[in-house]
Protein backbone atom coordinates (compact mmCIF):
# COMPACT_ATOMS: atom_id res chain seq x y z
CA UNK A 1 0.00 0.00 0.00
CA UNK A 2 1.01 3.60 -0.52
CA UNK A 3 2.63 5.29 2.47
CA UNK A 4 -0.08 7.97 2.56
CA UNK A 5 -2.54 5.28 3.64
CA UNK A 6 -0.97 5.41 7.11
CA UNK A 7 -2.21 8.97 7.51
CA UNK A 8 -5.74 7.94 6.57
CA UNK A 9 -5.70 4.93 8.90
CA UNK A 10 -4.49 6.85 11.94
CA UNK A 11 -6.69 9.88 11.31
CA UNK A 12 -9.70 7.58 10.83
CA UNK A 13 -8.92 5.69 14.04
CA UNK A 14 -8.96 8.92 16.06
CA UNK A 15 -11.58 10.74 13.99
CA UNK A 16 -14.17 11.15 16.74
CA UNK A 17 -12.13 10.94 19.96
CA UNK A 18 -11.32 14.67 20.09
CA UNK A 19 -7.61 14.05 20.60
CA UNK A 20 -5.03 16.47 19.19
CA UNK A 21 -2.35 13.80 18.92
CA UNK A 22 -1.82 10.48 17.19
CA UNK A 23 -0.42 8.14 19.88
CA UNK A 24 0.81 5.55 17.36
CA UNK A 25 2.85 8.04 15.32
CA UNK A 26 6.26 9.29 16.51
CA UNK A 27 5.40 8.45 20.13
CA UNK A 28 2.43 10.81 20.11
CA UNK A 29 2.87 13.47 17.41
CA UNK A 30 0.31 16.16 16.66
CA UNK A 31 -2.49 15.29 14.25
CA UNK A 32 -1.25 18.05 11.96
CA UNK A 33 1.99 16.08 11.49
CA UNK A 34 0.08 13.67 9.24
CA UNK A 35 -2.01 15.56 6.72
CA UNK A 36 -4.27 13.67 4.35
CA UNK A 37 -4.16 14.56 0.64
CA UNK A 38 -7.92 14.03 0.36
CA UNK A 39 -9.39 14.79 3.82
CA UNK A 40 -12.99 13.76 3.10
CA UNK A 41 -11.82 10.28 2.08
CA UNK A 42 -10.95 9.56 5.71
CA UNK A 43 -14.57 8.44 6.05
CA UNK A 44 -13.86 5.54 3.69
CA UNK A 45 -11.04 4.33 5.93
CA UNK A 46 -13.29 4.71 8.95
CA UNK A 47 -15.97 2.48 7.43
CA UNK A 48 -14.01 0.09 5.19
CA UNK A 49 -10.81 -1.98 5.24
CA UNK A 50 -7.76 -0.12 3.94
CA UNK A 51 -7.52 -2.11 0.70
CA UNK A 52 -11.21 -1.59 -0.08
CA UNK A 53 -11.06 2.12 0.73
CA UNK A 54 -8.02 2.56 -1.50
CA UNK A 55 -9.78 0.70 -4.33
CA UNK A 56 -12.82 2.96 -3.92
CA UNK A 57 -10.58 6.02 -4.22
CA UNK A 58 -9.06 4.61 -7.41
CA UNK A 59 -12.43 3.86 -8.99
CA UNK A 60 -13.93 7.20 -7.97
CA UNK A 61 -10.88 9.13 -9.17
CA UNK A 62 -10.82 7.41 -12.56
CA UNK A 63 -14.57 7.90 -12.97
CA UNK A 64 -14.44 11.62 -12.17
CA UNK A 65 -11.40 12.01 -14.42
CA UNK A 66 -13.16 10.34 -17.35
CA UNK A 67 -16.45 12.21 -16.97
CA UNK A 68 -14.70 15.54 -16.42
CA UNK A 69 -12.50 15.22 -19.49
CA UNK A 70 -15.42 14.01 -21.62
CA UNK A 71 -17.64 16.94 -20.61
CA UNK A 72 -14.83 19.45 -21.01
CA UNK A 73 -13.99 18.36 -24.55
CA UNK A 74 -17.66 18.09 -25.52
CA UNK A 75 -18.29 21.63 -24.25
CA UNK A 76 -15.20 22.99 -26.05
CA UNK A 77 -16.32 21.38 -29.33
CA UNK A 78 -19.68 23.17 -29.20
CA UNK A 79 -17.95 26.48 -29.94
CA UNK A 80 -15.82 25.04 -32.74
CA UNK A 81 -16.96 25.73 -36.30
CA UNK A 82 -15.26 22.55 -37.49
CA UNK A 83 -16.50 20.17 -34.80
CA UNK A 84 -19.85 21.64 -33.76
CA UNK A 85 -21.77 19.63 -36.37
CA UNK A 86 -19.88 16.38 -35.93
CA UNK A 87 -21.25 14.99 -32.71
CA UNK A 88 -20.23 11.43 -33.52
CA UNK A 89 -16.61 12.40 -34.07
CA UNK A 90 -16.59 14.66 -31.03
CA UNK A 91 -18.12 11.94 -28.86
CA UNK A 92 -15.54 9.38 -29.97
CA UNK A 93 -12.64 11.78 -29.40
CA UNK A 94 -13.97 12.87 -26.01
CA UNK A 95 -14.48 9.25 -24.96
CA UNK A 96 -10.98 8.26 -26.10
CA UNK A 97 -9.24 11.16 -24.40
CA UNK A 98 -11.38 10.67 -21.29
CA UNK A 99 -10.36 7.01 -21.07
CA UNK A 100 -6.71 7.89 -21.55
CA UNK A 101 -6.91 10.47 -18.77
CA UNK A 102 -8.76 8.09 -16.45
CA UNK A 103 -6.01 5.48 -16.84
CA UNK A 104 -3.10 7.81 -16.20
CA UNK A 105 -0.94 6.46 -13.35
CA UNK A 106 -2.13 8.93 -10.73
CA UNK A 107 -1.94 7.65 -7.16
CA UNK A 108 -5.44 7.14 -5.74
CA UNK A 109 -4.43 8.38 -2.27
CA UNK A 110 -4.30 11.91 -3.66
CA UNK A 111 -8.03 11.87 -4.33
CA UNK A 112 -9.15 14.46 -6.88
CA UNK A 113 -5.94 16.50 -6.72
CA UNK A 114 -5.17 15.31 -10.26
CA UNK A 115 -8.15 13.30 -11.44
CA UNK A 116 -10.62 16.06 -10.57
CA UNK A 117 -9.00 18.95 -12.46
CA UNK A 118 -10.85 18.56 -15.80
CA UNK A 119 -14.23 18.48 -14.05
CA UNK A 120 -13.27 21.54 -11.99
CA UNK A 121 -12.28 23.45 -15.12
CA UNK A 122 -15.52 22.42 -16.81
CA UNK A 123 -17.63 23.65 -13.88
CA UNK A 124 -15.74 26.95 -13.67
CA UNK A 125 -16.14 27.61 -17.39
CA UNK A 126 -19.85 26.79 -17.31
CA UNK A 127 -20.35 29.19 -14.40
CA UNK A 128 -19.30 32.02 -16.72
CA UNK A 129 -22.34 31.38 -18.91
CA UNK A 130 -25.17 33.66 -17.86
CA UNK A 131 -27.95 31.41 -19.17
CA UNK A 132 -27.26 28.64 -16.64
CA UNK A 133 -30.16 27.81 -14.34
CA UNK A 134 -29.91 28.11 -10.57
CA UNK A 135 -29.98 24.33 -10.26
CA UNK A 136 -27.05 23.97 -12.64
CA UNK A 137 -25.06 26.63 -10.81
CA UNK A 138 -25.68 24.91 -7.50
CA UNK A 139 -24.37 21.66 -8.98
CA UNK A 140 -21.22 23.41 -10.20
CA UNK A 141 -20.72 25.04 -6.79
CA UNK A 142 -21.26 21.67 -5.10
CA UNK A 143 -18.52 20.10 -7.18
CA UNK A 144 -16.12 22.95 -6.37
CA UNK A 145 -16.62 22.24 -2.66
CA UNK A 146 -16.42 18.48 -3.30
CA UNK A 147 -13.14 18.97 -5.14
CA UNK A 148 -11.72 20.99 -2.27
CA UNK A 149 -12.79 18.38 0.28
CA UNK A 150 -11.17 15.59 -1.72
CA UNK A 151 -7.94 17.23 -2.85
CA UNK A 152 -4.76 18.57 -1.32
CA UNK A 153 -4.01 22.25 -0.86
CA UNK A 154 -0.29 21.49 -1.01
CA UNK A 155 -0.32 19.22 -4.07
CA UNK A 156 -2.62 21.15 -6.39
CA UNK A 157 -4.89 23.48 -4.44
CA UNK A 158 -2.46 26.38 -4.15
CA UNK A 159 -1.77 26.27 -7.90
CA UNK A 160 -5.47 26.08 -8.74
CA UNK A 161 -6.29 29.02 -6.48
CA UNK A 162 -3.34 31.06 -7.76
CA UNK A 163 -3.96 30.52 -11.46
CA UNK A 164 -7.69 31.01 -10.97
CA UNK A 165 -7.10 34.29 -9.09
CA UNK A 166 -4.86 35.59 -11.87
CA UNK A 167 -7.55 34.70 -14.39
CA UNK A 168 -10.17 36.56 -12.38
CA UNK A 169 -7.96 39.64 -12.14
CA UNK A 170 -7.34 39.63 -15.90
CA UNK A 171 -11.07 39.18 -16.53
CA UNK A 172 -11.84 42.11 -14.22
CA UNK A 173 -9.34 44.34 -16.04
CA UNK A 174 -11.02 43.41 -19.32
CA UNK A 175 -14.44 44.04 -17.76
CA UNK A 176 -15.43 40.41 -18.24
CA UNK A 177 -15.52 39.52 -14.56
CA UNK A 178 -17.91 36.72 -13.58
CA UNK A 179 -19.47 36.98 -10.14
CA UNK A 180 -20.40 33.30 -10.24
CA UNK A 181 -16.79 32.30 -10.82
CA UNK A 182 -15.66 34.62 -8.05
CA UNK A 183 -18.08 32.97 -5.63
CA UNK A 184 -16.78 29.55 -6.65
CA UNK A 185 -13.19 30.68 -5.99
CA UNK A 186 -14.17 31.87 -2.52
CA UNK A 187 -15.92 28.57 -1.82
CA UNK A 188 -12.82 26.61 -2.77
CA UNK A 189 -10.61 28.86 -0.63
CA UNK A 190 -12.91 28.51 2.38
CA UNK A 191 -12.98 24.73 1.95
CA UNK A 192 -9.20 24.54 2.06
CA UNK A 193 -9.04 26.91 5.03
CA UNK A 194 -11.52 24.81 7.00
CA UNK A 195 -9.64 21.62 6.21
CA UNK A 196 -6.24 23.00 7.11
CA UNK A 197 -7.27 25.45 9.83
CA UNK A 198 -5.49 23.61 12.65
CA UNK A 199 -2.29 23.41 10.63
CA UNK A 200 -2.36 27.12 9.81
CA UNK A 201 -2.95 28.00 13.47
CA UNK A 202 0.02 25.86 14.48
CA UNK A 203 2.26 27.42 11.83
CA UNK A 204 1.42 30.95 12.93
CA UNK A 205 1.57 30.08 16.63
CA UNK A 206 -2.04 30.94 17.38
CA UNK A 207 -3.49 29.30 20.49
CA UNK A 208 -2.13 26.26 22.28
CA UNK A 209 -0.49 23.59 20.16
CA UNK A 210 1.68 20.57 20.69
CA UNK A 211 5.35 20.65 19.79
CA UNK A 212 5.86 19.25 16.30
CA UNK A 213 8.05 16.20 15.75
CA UNK A 214 10.40 18.34 13.66
CA UNK A 215 10.87 20.74 16.57
CA UNK A 216 11.59 17.81 18.87
CA UNK A 217 14.28 16.61 16.49
CA UNK A 218 15.87 20.06 16.55
CA UNK A 219 15.77 20.24 20.34
CA UNK A 220 17.35 16.84 20.82
Regions found by a protein language model. Give the residues of each.
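Short, charged/polar low-complexity linear motifs in solvent-exposed/disordered segments
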Residues: 173-174, 219
Amino acid sequence: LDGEVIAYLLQARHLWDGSDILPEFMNGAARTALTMPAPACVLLYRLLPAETALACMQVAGSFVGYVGMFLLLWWAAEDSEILSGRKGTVGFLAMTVGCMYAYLPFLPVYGLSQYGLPMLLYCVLRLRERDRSIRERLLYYAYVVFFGANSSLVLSGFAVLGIWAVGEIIAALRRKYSTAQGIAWILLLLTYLLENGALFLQIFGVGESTVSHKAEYALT
